[in-house]
Amino acid sequence: MKALRPFTLLPAVLLLTGCASLQVGSEFQSGRQAMLRGNDEAALAYFQSVAQKDPNYTYGTAYPQGILSYVGRTEYSTGKLPQARQTLERALAANRREDVARLYLGLTLVRAGDRAQGVKEIEGAMKGMYDWIEYITEAQRFSFGQFWDPGRDLRSAIQTQLAMVSGREADTPKLIAEAEWLGKRMEEEGDRARRDETTQQSRDNEGGGRSGGQ
């Protein structure tokens, strides 16, 4: 019996790799939808499964976030604070610019009793988010950047939150509520920006088609 040559196995390997990637992507989307609906236990199970299969999985292009950020955030939301801290610290070790992960690390620390360090992390995350939106809306103003926070509502909210955080006697429950709102709002903003960009592209294509036919 002749041995199979390496190149004869390549299509099968590529097929299996593609199927695995599709499965991981599908699991992630199921987890993300569960998270956005507030079903954090289900979301955590999905995210943990994705992390086991592909620990380097990243979601998003304009504002990429690693799978460890999602695992840590849902660990926080389900009250698993020690695990959330470890996971979020790992996420930041892999990418120091993941401000949503930093925000939830701060929330985790505040809830665990380390308010001073927690507030520091929350403040740093808020500044990072604000600066990123400012940068992307200017640097990519003729492309996808124009669809991020077009009315500056999110940036205005962050500025208000930063003023509250910088106060020495910031109310802890209010701080937690505002930071949790920001984490969810930042996640939703990416979806809204993508929808608006897709809608605009469809309108442009329709307009181009009508013009070409005249």
Residue ranges and their predicted role:
Residues 132-214:
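Terminal, low-structured helical/coil segments at or just beyond the last alpha-helical repeat
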Residues 51, 99, 107-134, 159-167:
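TPR/TPR-like (Sel1-like) alpha-helical repeat modules
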Residues 17-37:
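Bacterial Sec signal peptide processing site at the extreme N-terminus
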